[in-house]
């Protein structure tokens, strides 16, 4: 299973770790993924989904159905 948000498609970012002496090494910044069981109002069922915390924040603000439609995700497959 890859570390990708099932709702937004967010995945790891390539970055640099910089030491005190300014030596740079490559670093992989992973997405903060959480497994959640969310209630889908329109489908009248629970949805088990692995989402990023940013997506979870968006869901709390505008709702699961609206976030899924914006990102083109079919919640029936979960």
Swiss-Prot record:
Keyword Ribosomal protein among record annotations: yes
Organism superkingdom: Bacteria
Keywords per UniProt: Ribonucleoprotein, Ribosomal protein
GO molecular function: structural constituent of ribosome
Gene3D superfamilies given in the database record: Ribosomal protein L28/L24
Keyword Ribonucleoprotein found: yes
Listed GO CC annotations: ribonucleoprotein complex; ribosome
GO process terms (BP): translation
Disulfide cysteine pairs (residue numbers): none
PANTHER family documented for this protein: 39S RIBOSOMAL PROTEIN L28, MITOCHONDRIAL, LARGE RIBOSOMAL SUBUNIT PROTEIN BL28M
Family as reported in the entry's similarity comment: Belongs to the bacterial ribosomal protein bL28 family.
Name listed for the protein in its UniProt record: Large ribosomal subunit protein bL28
């Amino acid at each position: 299973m890859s570390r990708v948000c099932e709702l937004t498609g967010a995945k790891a970012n390539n970055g640099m770790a910089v030491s005190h002496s300014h030596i740079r090494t490559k670093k992989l910044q992973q997405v903060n993924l959480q497994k959640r069981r969310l209630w889908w109002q329109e489908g009248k069922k629970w949805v088990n989904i692995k989402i990023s915390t940013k997506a979870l924040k968006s869901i709390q603000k505008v709702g699961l159905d609206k976030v899924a439609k914006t990102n083109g995700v079919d919640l029936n497959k979960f």
